[in-house]
Amino acid sequence: MRLNRLFSVAMLSIIFGGTASAQQPYGGCWHPEHVKNWSPETDKNAKFNRSKVPLAKRFKEPTLMKANKNQFYEGQVCNATILFPTCSSCPSQGANNFLGYQPTYWQYMDKLVYWAGSASEGIIIPPPAPSTDAAHQSGVKSLGQIFFPPYAFGGNQAWVREMLTKENGSYIFAKKLYEIAKYMGFDGWFINQESGGSTLSEWAGFIKEFNALADADGNSHMEIQWYNASGSPSPTILKSHKNTSQFLEYGANGDYRGQASQLGCT
């Protein structure tokens, strides 16, 4: 009798354990074809992936507390970090394990980028909602990832061309990416373009359209950060919008203050 009870309990655990696993909501990890017609009504996990904490005003210490005369508030720190090892299995609202990573040094950064995505899993990845909540409490922007990998890592120029699709003169994915960011409560996107197959002027137009939608909708804080493995600033990209930033290639260094007017900076 006892053996039968143990067997029954084991079977119930397997059945309901599988059901619980099937019901676990996950964060977005998409290819372009899955984003084109995205809406919260058709995405069963959308409501679990929303940040509800507004972006706080960033604290600035008094001038007298500056470390030296060359320290300026205009200089910002962006933390591009792996918040979860695989974007396709990132839980929407935390988990009972230590796989996820949550920064605790918010005072030392101004922007958080979810470093994620792969050719096999997905290349369009919104940041985890709990990470955005935590970032916003400290006035830190939270950016999702759009990753066009190099050919050696499965890069496909067809994804680039699809992302830059125009209909009636408008970049349809710029609009959709804005809708996703607005609904999920984060602050824009990091575009990692290492697949080729496009021009800087095309992406500048894409960025302009994204920010025009955000500005018109009262979300003028939103931004796109650009990376294409270049070690030099791109005037074409940086002049797209006042919020646009660029991640220079690793190891790049130099003083670009003399190019401020060319880069649309003040």
Name these PLM-found stretches.
Residues 1-8:
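Bacterial N-terminal signal peptides that target proteins for export
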Residues 266:
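Glycine-rich, aromatic-lined ligand/substrate-binding cores of catalytic
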Residues 8-17:
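Bacterial N-terminal signal peptides
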Residues 70-263:
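Chitinase-like catalytic core of GlcNAc-active glycosidases
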Residues 22-96, 100-102, 106, 216:
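N-terminal module-boundary/linker segments of secreted carbohydrate-active enzymes
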Residues 17-19, 252:
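Intrinsically disordered low-complexity regions specifically enriched for long asparagine
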Residues 1, 19-22:
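Basic/polar N-terminal segments that are highly enriched at the extreme N-terminus
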Residues 13-14, 23-24, 184:
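Compositionally biased, low-complexity repeat tracts
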